């Protein structure tokens, strides 16, 4: 199921449980009525995929997985399996997770920029705005998401063909060398997640550059990912070089122990966390999505030795909000805070 060829398209006339045909029809109609709308969608998708979210593939996959587990009320387990290219099949990254399965609201969210279905998930949810999934476009032109036998996929080739049939888009397509906002045009898919998981995101690699980026991001997985996403209990990174497992658990005294099979010993993290409600006037000039979650939280985390003395963290020296931003942090600790961000997580 984690190979690209295991994701299939239902035969014509079969049920379309996520109403992808309706979503495509609405988008194509809007593009036909206004080439400016097509241009707006294309620019927005490119900005996210090639700009702010280009290097956030693993973080966004983990964040979506953690939020799905939060919705289901279960601990999140995430397995990232990388298959090398074989014969005529491209290299593939498969991200399988436990948690709430794919539903129609999630499909619409994935296919609609800045229209997240997570607004009612409560303060434990991390995802915002519905833009994070665009990170998959940094490495793949054929992403798919399936759970419990049904799913959704996207295809640049098929999206290009659909857009070519829309009157009035010929000039735009030529100007963009045939690139179209493919996430706006979902297609039905069939398949299932590996045993013991609920959902899998399948990403056939576009080219060698995509493979290199994915390998670098997989190698960069560290303790900060599990500390930033408290419901993320386990991450397994399975590549041709071997299998690496990271887990987190709370131990006596409230410290968090992160065990990494690639490390010589576990790391014990001491956390101090504060949080509360935000006064409405502090959010008056913030986007609606933020005003619907009027809470704040701040956590400092420091690795400690057996005698309790602090050590310098080996995590990236940047502010986490709660996942990494590009804001540098010059203090020898890990900062996780609900700071306001723009859509590119700056």
Model region roles, listed by residue range:
Residues 69-72, 114:
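A generic alpha-to-beta junction signature in SAM-dependent methyltransferases
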Residues 74-83:
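A conserved short beta-strand within the histidine kinase catalytic ATPase domain
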Residues 72-73, 106:
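Conserved ATPase-coupling elements of RecA-like P-loop NTPase cores
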């Amino acid at each position: 199921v984690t190979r690209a060829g295991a994701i299939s398209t239902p035969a014509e006339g079969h049920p379309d449980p996520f109403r992808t045909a309706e979503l495509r029809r609405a988008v194509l109609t809007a593009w036909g009525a206004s080439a400016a709308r097509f241009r707006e969608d294309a620019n927005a998708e490119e900005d996210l995929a090639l700009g702010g979210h280009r290097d956030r593939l693993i973080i966004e996959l983990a964040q979506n997985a953690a939020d799905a587990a939060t919705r289901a009320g279960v601990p999140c387990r995430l397995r990232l399996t990388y298959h090398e290219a074989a014969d005529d099949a491209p290299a593939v990254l498969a991200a399988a997770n436990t948690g709430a399965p794919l539903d129609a609201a999630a499909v619409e969210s994935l296919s609609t920029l800045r229209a997240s279905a997570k607004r009612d998930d409560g303060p434990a949810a991390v995802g915002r705005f519905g833009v994070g999934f665009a990170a998959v476009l940094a490495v793949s032109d054929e992403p798919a998401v399936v759970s419990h036998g049904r799913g959704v996929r996207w295809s640049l080739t098929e999206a290009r063909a659909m857009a070519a049939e829309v009157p009035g888009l010929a000039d735009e397509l030529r100007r963009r060398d045939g690139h179209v906002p493919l996430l706006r045009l979902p297609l039905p898919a069939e398949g299932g997640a590996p045993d013991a998981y609920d959902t899998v995101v399948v990403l056939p690699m576009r080219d060698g550059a995509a493979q290199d980026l994915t390998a670098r991001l997989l190698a960069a997985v560290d303790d900060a990912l599990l500390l930033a996403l408290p419901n993320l209990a386990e991450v397994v990174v399975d590549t041709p070089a071997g299998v690496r497992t990271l887990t987190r658990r709370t131990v006596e005294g409230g410290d968090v122990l992160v065990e990494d099979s690639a490390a010589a010993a576990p790391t014990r993290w001491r956390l101090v966390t504060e949080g509360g409600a935000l006064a409405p006037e502090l959010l008056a000039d913030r986007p609606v999505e933020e005003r619907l979650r009027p809470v704040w939280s701040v956590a400092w985390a420091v690795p400690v030795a057996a005698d309790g003395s602090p050590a310098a963290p080996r995590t990236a020296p940047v502010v986490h909000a709660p996942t990494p931003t590009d804001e540098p942090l010059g203090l020898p600790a890990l900062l996780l805070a609900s700071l306001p961000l723009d859509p590119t997580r700056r």
